[in-house]
Amino acid sequence: MKILMLAPEPFFQPRGTPISIYFRIKALSDLGHNVDLVTYHLGEDKRINGLKILRIPDLFSIKRIKIGPSFTKIPLDFLLLCKATWQMMKKHYDLIFSHEEAGWFGTALAKIWGIPHIYDMHSSLPQQLENFGFSRSKLIKRIFLRLERFVLKNSKAVIVICLDLEAKLKELGFEAKARLLENFIDFEYPEISEDEIRRKREEYAPRGVKIVLYVGNFQPYQGIPFLLEAAEKIRDGRVNFLLVGGESADVEKMKRMAMYLNISDRVHFTGQVAHSKVPLFISLGDVLVSPRRSGTNTPLKIYSFLKSGKPVVATNLWTHTQVLNNKISVLVEPEVESLAKGIYFALFNEEAKERARAAREMADREFTYPRYKKIISDVLEKACGGGRKS
């Protein structure tokens, strides 16, 4: 099939939704389909068979787009709509495949041209307004809710990335359109040598000192201050904390908090690192932690954590428990004392290692690329009645 994909993202950048989009395209390519991707002017070009990247013009000199809703995206999405409309006018497509807010006009274009539409629902956009503190306006939320319902009603199939979104579609009466596809696929990198791990580890922890690792952005919902408060409770010279990621301004803010808590000597920050380096940092960790205190979507990092064979500590909230349980991780209440105790348990209790082994076995069994590709094929079948090549 010839597919027009609409992605209101900087593609490619190593963050949640662009990573997800990359693997959607890869699976479509491996199934024999061609994808024209209309996306923002920012990002690294990626080479995939059958992929053509069509970028909007850089009319506003915008160099950065933050995660979540922003006013910056409004003019960019208008240009995305114009580019998508132009593509529809000059070329025949069998299907429109939209991500996030591009679903608003992707469904409209599909209706006008009489072709199926697939909506890739990475999140509930009305909920994102609250999660990122973008707006508390009831009017704006009502508008977003109506737009979301319009997209769901007029899409032939909807991909949801977690059980929470699947439940939302069921609640709204669109259960038959939903197909759960967790973002469990990640890039494969060359094997890391023990010598490389040892050298990198020496930068952050003396011999015999264990490392508690966090990887991700420093957005408020991630719970970084909460993690630092827990670190302050673990007064053990055998434990260091390593936080990988974060914008420079956010990192500086957390460094000041670490100084205030008098834990700067055992809490280290790397700032943002290349996505290709993340597996190296994961290999350094003795325990991997996700201290989220809000949100409902499953963090992408959880899948990498489970595959690592390292003990995972996470808050006992729906954002995590859609995937995690106490057989494969250490779940803690979203309280400082509970997180500190959970980390200590994961570091020094043999049972935590048993859970980590069980997690890896489950991930190796369940989180496979053939299964991922099969789900994409099923979504095409649902939308088009065959997912045929052309």
Residue ranges and their predicted role:
Residues 326-337, 345-350:
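Conserved acidic donor-binding segment of nucleotide-sugar-dependent glycosyltransferases
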Residues 164, 184:
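Carbohydrate-associated surface elements
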Residues 23, 82-89, 104, 108-112, ...:
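Membrane-proximal helix-turn-helix segments that form the acceptor-binding/catalytic region
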Residues 350-381:
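A charged, aromatic-enriched C-terminal amphipathic alpha-helix characteristic of glycosyltransferases
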Residues 1-45, 226, 234:
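N-terminal subdomain of nucleotide-sugar transferases
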Residues 215, 240-255, 271:
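Glycosyltransferase donor-sugar binding loop
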Residues 156, 266, 280-297, 310-311:
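Acidic donor-binding loop of glycosyltransferase active sites
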Residues 252-277:
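Nucleotide-activated donor-binding/catalytic signature segment of Leloir-type glycosyltransferases, i.e.
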